[in-house]
Design a protein with these regions (language model features):
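Active-site microenvironments that recognize anionic phosphate/pyrophosphate groups
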Residues: 1-148, 154-226, 235, 249-251, ...
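Gly/Ser/Thr-rich active-site loops/lids in small-molecule metabolic enzymes
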Residues: 229, 233-242
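Short, glycine/acidic-rich beta->alpha junctions
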Residues: 115, 242-243
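An acidic, glycine-/histidine-flanked metal-binding catalytic module
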Residues: 244, 248
Length: 325
């Protein structure tokens, strides 16, 4: 049985004892139409007028986190551990086995957005879960071994370290300057322009100043909102779909494998990001991160300490802008 264990030196949590199993039968894609029996029952489906699904969500075949598990928090001397309570869902993004995100129509992307938002809102009702995040891996170098386009939804009893770090640093900035850190970053990036890949009325796509991967790009709202799931205005949703699809058409010309993450505010902020003086909605700012995985870092291997990349964000932004979208 898998469980969560806390590293006392870094305060990070790891899942131990997890053994993923291969999905489906030999030669069959479990996510393709007609193979629904190879997956758990659907939690939610969007269906067309013909009665066929075109977006489908179900519990992961080999979940990292499980709803039926108890928290069961325990201490072993100096060490802390707990059950891997949570949820792990798969969203099959469309019926096509070979369609990549750069090929999506705007309407297909909007339906996918709707499913993301529905599942985040639903899972956040469970008070055991402190964070619900959505991510997508494409390509084996990104850790995906089923080619059929799909995303993951993870609801966890602890806030992931990257989200926790963002919450802590955005709160610190807000307390010092009474402004949102990402709002300030967006304003500076637009003024300078050198790392901007594309821009529309409501969003900007940038290669971040301290990129961890070659051609890493973020899509950030030009307005302040902590919660991706709050995005309901249809004009704004169309702008998000347009800039994401434009960016993915550029990135897929340069990278065969990538991860997409939607960073939305946690339900319960980490301790250092919480206080009566300021609410997380004031300082956290949701955004999407696209992390290409094709490229090797230099010989320095302490990837948990420093990321070393071969191209500057400014060069990456120029290269992405040169790609046809």
């Amino acid at each position: 049985m898998a469980e969560l264990r806390k590293d006392p030196l870094s305060s990070s949590w790891v899942v131990v004892g997890y053994g993923a199993t291969k999905s489906g039968s030999a030669g069959l894609c479990p996510f393709c139409p007609g193979n629904e029996s190879l997956t758990p029952p659907a939690i939610r489906e969007y269906k067309g007028s013909d009665g066929n699904w075109f977006v489908r969500c179900f519990s992961a075949i080999a979940p990292v986190f499980m709803i039926e598990v108890e928290e069961d928090k325990k201490a072993e001397g100096i060490y802390d551990k707990m059950g891997n309570v949570g949820a792990h869902e798969i969203i099959v993004e469309n019926r096509s086995h070979t369609k990549t995100m750069s090929m999506y129509t705007e309407q297909e992307f909007l339906f996918l957005m709707d499913m993301y938002q529905e599942r985040i809102i639903d899972l956040k009702q469970d008070r055991r879960f402190k964070s619900v995040q959505v991510f997508k891996n494409h390509g084996e170098l990104a850790g995906s071994y089923i080619f059929h386009p799909h995303s993951h939804v993870l609801a966890t009893p602890i806030v992931p370290s990257r989200i926790a770090s963002e919450a802590i640093h955005t709160r610190t900035h807000y307390l010092q300057k009474e402004r949102c850190l990402l709002c300030d970053i967006v304003n500076q990036e637009i003024r300078q322009g050198i790392r901007v890949v594309s821009i529309n009325k409501n969003f900007v796509a940038i290669c971040p100043f301290a990129s961890r991967f070659p051609y890493e790009a973020w899509v950030v709202p030009r307005f302040h909102d902590a919660y991706y799931e709050n995005l309901h205005d249809q004009n704004i949703k169309h702008d998000f779909a347009a800039i994401m699809l434009d960016l993915m058409r550029r990135i897929e010309q340069l990278a065969n494998a990538y991860t997409i993450e939607i960073h939305t505010a946690p339900t319960v902020p980490p301790g250092d990001a919480h206080g009566e003086d300021v609410h997380i909605a004031d300082h956290y700012h949701w955004h999407a991160e696209i992390l290409p995985r094709d490229f090797r870092s230099s010989k320095y291997k302490r990837e948990d300490e420093f990321q070393v990349i071969s191209i500057t964000p400014e060069q990456a932004a120029d290269a992405l802008k040169m790609q046809e979208s």
